[in-house]
Amino acid sequence: IMFLIMGFCNGSCAGFAIPIAQAFGARDYAKMRAYVSNSIRIAVVFAVVITFLSCIFCGKILHLVNTPKEVFDDAYIFLMLQFAAIPFTIGYNLLSGQIRALGNSKQPFYFLITASVINIILDAILILGMGLGVEGAGIATWLSQGISVLLCIWFIKKKMQILIPKGEERKFDNKKISILLNNGVPMGLQFSITAIGLIMLQSANNALGTVYVAAFTASMRIKYLFTCVFENIGVAMATYCGQNLGARKLDRIGQGVRASIRMMLVYFVFTFLLIYPFADEMMMLFVDKGEAEVVTYAAQFMRIANYFYPCLGLLTILRYSI
């Protein structure tokens, strides 16, 4: 469910960055800032509408995927807290996409890593230390994503003031809105369509009982922390290709794709060396040690899923590059 909604938000924001990158590559900075201004308008509307609809239909969505009665209340609370963080998710992806559009892929990555580490630390404190359960997991996500947005805002104001619109560049522009939506919405739908398969998997898994639901939920949280790197490599490629397309340097696009694939494979080796021996220990961050069966199934899922990370990484890179 979260991947369906967040995937649309992330993909859309990545698409919004493409016209910005193309204008930057063509050295048309006024046009670039006009795209920035109008992309912020769209993002605000998306954040309000998606958050509102997600919260309104949260219960119906959980019934649709056969959520067991034993965990329904906890799942509802967790999802509502996740949905409350949608504006932060959109804000981070929009701002980090704008930073990448100017050729800086490192800083958004550092901010993402910082937010992920903070998320893990807060999970440990709120879930294990304070015993807040799913409420703690939701609060941790909310706070960590909020911090990532603040970091992006701080960086743009300090280091990338060229992105800040001024004067006429702040005007509402129907043509630019249309171009932004034509790039953003299809990329968002790509992720949403992929997520339909995950929802079917979640629905089938829910029918197996609470042990499997708990195992799947815990493993997906850790899995996302690892696989979000693939998404960020792909997003970086979207802006990289946009820049070089705008500058008419088409030969650099192929070089970038090959380099990103090599980077993805190196990262896969790192995840394999970390996940295969330590999956059980990682699951214990989210599952009580006494729930041995849940830990076992969650760790098994993590190890099996890890074998297919190269396929996911390759798909993400090529999809964003195209």
Q: Where are the language model's segments positioned?
A:
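Short alpha-helical transmembrane segments in multi-pass integral membrane proteins
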Residues: 20-85, 129-185, 241-308
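Small-residue (Gly/Pro/Ala) motifs that create kinks and tight helix-helix packing interfaces
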Residues: 96, 119-123, 127, 140
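Short, non-helical or kinked segments that cap or interrupt transmembrane helices
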Residues: 103-110, 134-138
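Alpha-helical transmembrane segments of compact multi-pass small-molecule transporters, enriched
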Residues: 118-119, 285
